[in-house]
Amino acid sequence: MSSPPEGKLETKAGHPPAVKAGGMRIVQKHPHTGDTKEEKDKDDQEWESPSPPKPTVFISGVIARGDKDFPPAAAQVAHQKPHASMDKHPSPRTQHIQQPRK
């Protein structure tokens, strides 16, 4: 088979197709360039914008005020496990020993 011309590279999903030899795929490592990261950082800086204002939240028709309505201590009490009023003891089990037949 002839190799593709150097000027025109056929790509699949943004990368060159896999090379096979003897039915097995051969991994080809390509060195990465640092230019793409710098360009990406520049793009991020250009598109950065301040976060949009948070919308007001209504709970049952009243404006919620965040932690003022639900203090962290109240939430902590709601998530604590209730203590049992009586201690539970395991029921006594009869012990059965498996023995071979005669």
Curated annotation (Swiss-Prot):
Entry keywords, A to Z: Acetylation, Apoptosis, Autophagy, Phosphoprotein, Translation regulation
N-acetylserine modified-residue sites: S2
UniProt xrefs under InterPro entries: DAP1/DAPL1
GO process annotations (BP): apoptotic process; apoptotic signaling pathway; autophagy; negative regulation of autophagy; ribosome hibernation
Post-translational modification, as annotated: Phosphorylated. Phosphorylation by MTOR inhibits the suppressive activity of DAP toward autophagy.
Residue stretches of biased makeup (Basic and acidic residues): 32-43
Superkingdom to which the source organism belongs: Eukaryota
Function: Ribosome-binding protein involved in ribosome hibernation, a process during which ribosomes are stabilized in an inactive state and preserved from proteasomal degradation. Acts via its association with eiF5a (EIF5A and EIF5A2) at the polypeptide exit tunnel of the ribosome, preventing mRNA translation. Involved in ribosome hibernation in the mature oocyte by preventing mRNA translation, leading to ribosome inactivation. Ribosomes, which are produced in large quantities during oogenesis, are stored and translationally repressed in the oocyte and early embryo.
Subunit structure: Associates with ribosomes; inhibiting translation. Interacts with eiF5a (EIF5A and EIF5A2); inhibiting translation.
Family: Belongs to the DAP-DAPL1 family.
Name of this protein: Death-associated protein 1
Species this chain originates from: Homo sapiens
Name of the coding gene: DAP
